[in-house]
Each structure stands twice: as C-alpha cells, then as structure tokens.
Regions:
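Beta-loop-alpha module in the N-terminal Rossmann-like domain of NAD(P)-dependent dehydrogenases
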Residues: 12, 23-86
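Predominantly a Rossmann-like dinucleotide-binding segment in NAD(P)-dependent oxidoreductases
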Residues: 100-197, 330
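C-terminal helix-rich "cap/oligomerization" subdomain common to oxidoreductases
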Residues: 43-46, 81, 292-338
C-alpha cells in the first residue's frame, strides 16, 4: 500500500509503546498534541472516545493534517458543524470511518439499486445483532458513559444511518427512536464496585426518507443490539416496487424479484483483507478504504470516491440527535434540514 505508521499516541503510554514495538512505529507519545504537530505525519486517525473527537480534529486540521475520524463524529450536531467548518476552511482531506461503504457487496448493491433493478424503494430494514457487551461482568468503560459518547446508537446506529443515506441517495426526514439499557451497572476496574451505565445497549428505530431518484414515500426500520445472544448479524435489506436486495455480514448479496417468492445469489468479487486483521465485514471494508485513502493522499486529492466526508458525518449526527430527542419524548421527531 506504500503507507507507514510513523507515530502513535495514547493516554496509556505503556500501551502505545507496546504497539509501537510490535509494529515498528518510531515515534510514541503520551499526548495526542505531540502527534498532530509531528512533521512526518500526513494523516491523523482519531480512534478515541467521541467526546474527544472535536478537540483532536480541530487541532489536526489547524496543522493542515488530513483526518480520518471514527464514528460517531462528535457528541452532537453542534460539534460536528464546527468540525465541518474547520475542514472546509483548511481544504484538506477530512473523512469519517464508515468503512462498510467499501465492501464489494454493498457497492454492487448500490449500483443495482441505482440502475433500477428493484424499482422505486419502498422500505429498508437493518438488523445488527451481537453479544459484544452481553456479559454483565464486562468492566465499565467509556462505552458505558453517555458523557463520553458511548452506546449502541452512536457506535452502530451511525453506520446504519450512513448506510441508508449513501445507499438510497436520500435524507432521513423524520425518526422515531426507542433506546434501552438492559445492563444497568458494570464493575468498576478501579474501585471493584458497581458503576452506573448511562448509555443504551439496544435501539429500535423507525425512519422516513426524502423523495428522490430512487425513493418515493420510503420508510425504514432498524433493530440494533449489542447484548443479544445467537448468531452475529449485520444485515441490510432494501425492498422496492420490482423486488428486493439483501446483503449479509458474510458479504453475500441476494436479490428477490417481485413475485418470485425466493432469494437468489448475486455474484460479487471477494473482498481483500490485510494480514493480521480479524475476519469480518469491518476489516474487509477498512482494508479497501485504507488503500483508497493512501491513493488519494499520494495524488494530492482532498476527496476519496465513495467515502463519507465530514459533511456526511454532520448529516448522520443530525439524525442521531433527533433519535435521542424522540426517545426522550416518545414521539416522532423531524430531522433538521439545512
């Protein structure tokens, strides 16, 4: 790929040093400010809790570094808007890590949808099921803390919303959200006692979409859980006037023409995955995304084809904010459009 990791920073310097030793990273810092100011750094990858994203991103952009920011982009749309404004003013590459866009199966799915293979979209359904945080004895961490941006809605719901927007080329106009916290306390590693969990571990979401070239009166639903046992699922379904498309965690893509009553496979090229990464859609998507980022940086471009920009991150954040407001009011909420 022709890229080199030249520096790593962590609040836990000992961990950073261990990673640096394993992968031959020359510069180690206990403060991210050293990293974003380093002369050899071209791209800053922000993989810290969401509450820290805005400060790190703004500083990196001030140093004219390209930025790849983990999702959710920020704690709220106000913070995200500031990040967009700064990125636009500096004119550098600024992306959100929505790597699922780079899976071959999803790219083929989007191409088929846009070519009219299933007609006008009527409904979308997204299912994410994992027991990643299903064990109550798992220690309290930032994922358990609302103030730090933890929770299933931000971590997984952001991917769901981005998938809807990118796949349909439409905006979310209205939402209804129900967030739940099933494991309400977790062990504190410092005190040994139990600490309150202030974030959601399940989300049930409904959506309405704007009309566009592929949508007319379209609706959507999502079921997200990180405390559900059983088979791990990351499944996206789109139902149209002429048929349906479905992509699964495995990368398999299926089509069901209206009236057929069955799914049939769609041939998709296998995704490549970097050595040493854990098997899964996230790793396969990120491998392709990373290659595209490096190619753009080498070419001096400030965009990456198909990648989620800071503007996309802001749009997703508007939807997440509306979903949280809906959960509080138990009512449908309109998403801010500007």
């Amino acid at each position: 790929m022709g890229a080199k990791v030249v520096a790593i920073a962590s609040g836990h310097r000992d961990r950073a040093e261990a990673v640096a030793k394993e992968f031959g990273i020359e510069h180690v810092a206990g403060d991210w400010r050293e990293l974003v100011a380093h002369s050899e750094v071209d791209l800053v990858s922000i993989v810290t809790p969401p509450s820290t994203h805005i400060e790190i991103a703004l500083a990196a952009l001030d140093h004219r570094k390209a930025v790849l920011c983990e999702k959710p982009m920020a704690l709220n749309a106000g913070e995200a808007a500031r990040m967009v404004e700064k990125a636009n003013s500096m004119g550098v590459l600024a992306l959100i890590d929505h790597e699922l866009r780079f899976l071959n199966s999803r790219r083929v799915m989007r191409g088929m949808l846009q070519s009219g293979a299933i007609g006008i979209v009527r409904h979308c359904n997204y299912v994410f099921r994992s027991d990643y945080r299903g064990i109550a004895d798992r220690a309290w961490d930032w994922w358990s803390d609302e103030a730090m941006g933890g929770g299933a809605l931000g971590a997984i719901g952001s991917h769901v919303v981005d998938s809807f927007r990118w796949m349909l080329s439409a905006e979310v106009t209205d939402v209804l959200g129900m967030l739940s916290t099933h494991i309400k306390q977790r062990p504190d590693k410092t005190t040994g006692g139990l600490r309150e969990v202030t974030t959601d571990d399940e989300a049930k979401l409904l959506f309405r979409f704007s009309d566009g070239p592929h949508t007319q009166g379209a609706t959507g639903a999502a079921s997200i859980s990180v405390v559900e046992s059983g088979k791990y699922e990351n499944r996206f379904e789109i139902y149209g006037s002429k048929g349906a498309l479905m992509v699964e965690e495995t990368g398999e893509l299926w089509i069901s023409p209206t009236g057929s009553g069955a799914w049939r496979p769609v041939q998709v090229d296998q995704d490549h995955m970097a050595r040493g990464m854990r098997e899964g859609s996230w790793s396969r998507g990120f491998t392709a995304f990373a290659v595209a980022i490096v190619e753009s940086l080498r070419a001096g471009r400030t965009t990456v084809k198909d990648a989620a920009t800071f503007e996309d991150g802001y749009r997703v954040q508007l939807v997440l904010d509306a979903l949280r407001a809906s959960n509080e009011s138990s009512c449908w909420v309109s998403v801010k459009q500007d």
